[in-house]
Amino acid sequence: DTDGDGYVLIESYSNDGTKTDNEYMESLNAKKIQGYVKKSILFQVTPSSKYALLVDKLRQKMYIFEAGAIIGELDVSTGLNNAKQPYNESPAGEYITVSKVGDFDAGGRTIGRFAIRINGGTLLHEVLHDKAADGTRIYTQYEAQLGMKASHGCIRIQRRANAQGQNMQWLWNNLENKTKVFIWDDQGRQMYEPELPDSSLQLYRNPNGGSNYHVDENCSG
């Protein structure tokens, strides 16, 4: 929206690590800032083309893309809302990463690591852990929640490396600023089992070469 003097109403989120009097809430939700700026000083941001992330709230998975192809997937926990705290839902949409926040205190002795802020204010971070008196990180409670909604709105991401060596620390080390992040909603969607062919289906291969199976014995590929 613009007013009559060529100004545009914008909104942003604090990302400088400054804490409010409510440290716990500030660590989870960046402080929202609104104001008018001159339209002439605005410019379009070009997202990084190296990687992209897709968070599927239905499957509670994060998919890592490179050059348009999926190169890995990670278990996540997105926001769990309820009647009293509907704002805990992780908002679906299209975002970019805007800053690396690092480790943060999520209340008491609970810590989140490698936090990256997206422009919607949400944090992507390693699954939480409780810090024992001797400094040991205890992930048991929060790792058990991966694959289901559990957070206050942030995206918790697995710490154990997948087969490709990817985890939250890998994202921290490899993602450039302004990486595209897509969050798919789960409302109105259903998860289906993969469609498997009937056991009686006859499959053929081309005897002259080719690696694909076909249902037609006169296949050509």
Where are these regions (language model features)?
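Acidic glycine-/aspartate-rich tracts in secreted/extracellular proteins
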Residues: 3, 15-16, 69, 102, ...
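Zinc-coordinating Cys/His ligand positions in small cysteine/histidine-rich zinc-finger domains
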Residues: 38-39, 157-159, 214
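Gly/Pro-biased beta-strand-loop elements
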Residues: 30-137
